[in-house]
A protein has these predicted regions:
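PLP-dependent enzyme catalytic core of the Aspartate aminotransferase-like
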Residues: 20, 77, 84, 100-152
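Active-site C-terminal subdomain of aminotransferase-like
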Residues: 1-68, 72-101
Length: 152
């Protein structure tokens, strides 16, 4: 069973869950749209974009799409430098928190797979997964911009 403190934390968090999820979803959509316009990004994977192959399904089934997106860096971008240049968005395996986090699946969640298997699954060295938090979307975009500048 849960401790009284854990129950209190859970109860307190549930009161703001809808607000936090809505902020994450809104921020993710804004960032996904911004990334599609960035010439240093070759592809953006976000079901809220009309260009996503499953957008019509997501539109029917989801309310807000998600706070998670992935994007592929152009080959000219050094992924490690990009990740290390981020200041507000933190490299982390943690997902769906109030703070934005990012990781390279090829180095984290899929690191134990061989290169051939990762390639079959669409996991390249330049693929990044961004879990968008509730920070101001303009601050997140500024952080991404400066990381692109430093890594190009």
């Amino acid at each position: 069973s849960l401790s009284e403190y854990a129950v209190w934390l859970l109860e307190r968090s549930m009161k703001t869950l809808a607000l936090r999820v809505r902020a994450q979803n809104n921020n993710a959509k804004i960032i996904a749209e911004w990334l599609t316009e960035n010439p240093l990004v070759s592809q953006v994977f976000y079901p809220g974009l009309k260009s996503h192959p499953n957008h019509s399904i997501a539109k029917k089934q989801m309310n807000g799409y998600t706070g998670m997106l992935s994007f592929e860096l152009e080959k000219s971008i050094n992924g490690k430098t990009f990740l290390n240049s981020l200041r507000l968005i933190k490299p982390s395996m943690s997902l769906a928190g109030v703070e934005s986090t990012i990781l390279a699946p090829s180095k984290a969640s899929h690191a134990l797979l061989g290169e051939e298997e990762r390639k079959k699954q669409g996991i390249s060295e330049g693929l990044l997964r961004l879990s968008v938090g509730i920070e101001d979307s303009n601050d997140l975009i500024l952080d991404l911009k400066q990381a692109f500048t430093k890594s190009n």
